[in-house]
């Protein structure tokens, strides 16, 4: 009988656990199956499979799920970054309009690195709201794009814009009849995202450098410090949990019956 070391046993056990927690929609975020599952053409009249990454601010999609976006794009998916705001409050000492112009250019530069498309919503950084008008705006984008997969913020977060973004997407998911797979991503866990316990991981080791290149496009945000002090350590920590160098972590929310948070009338 072949002897199995404790390390190999743990790694195998981790793999079994990851498989058990794999997505019901053919393991979209299961790193071991990305190259195989995601390279296959869509079953819907040959159209590309589509994912939306919906973030509250410019730089949120790239920092919370940039590696996964790149892997999806490499596998032939159409990926759209949806920015709830233009980052109007994100640069001290200048007007909201000036900040928005700078940060919009940074978003476009980041999307050129990743290859994702981009869309901007009409909310204002630091003053996002939950009402029917803003809910309809998110729902209209989702209905127009018809994604199979949506990634957005984890709802338990110290930043109000992150919470509002998460709730708006959640209600759109419910109203659409759970028509897409919904995943929550973490933002600076322990500082912003709280009580985040992953159900799924993606090994982003092969694309970590490209993810960081996209993040660095957001020059106005002091990204070297943000990456070095928060995001890269978080990627390495999730990598240790998933037995790789760098990983992104997610919570997969499955459809259920629950009251809406948004007024529908």
Report each predicted region and the residues it spans.
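Divalent metal-coordination and catalytic microenvironments
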Residues: 59, 85, 107, 118, ...
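ATP-dependent adenylation/pyrophosphate-handling site
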Residues: 51-58, 62-96
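N-terminal secretory signal peptides
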Residues: 1-4
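Glycine-rich phosphate-binding loop and adjoining beta1-alpha1-beta2 segment
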Residues: 94-114
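Hydrophobic anchor at the start of a short beta-strand
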Residues: 79, 118, 180
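Metal-dependent de-N-acetylase/amidase catalytic core
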Residues: 6, 10-19, 30-54, 112, ...
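Acidic/histidine-rich helix-loop elements
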Residues: 88-101, 124-129
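A conserved beta-strand->alpha-helix junction
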Residues: 84, 111-126
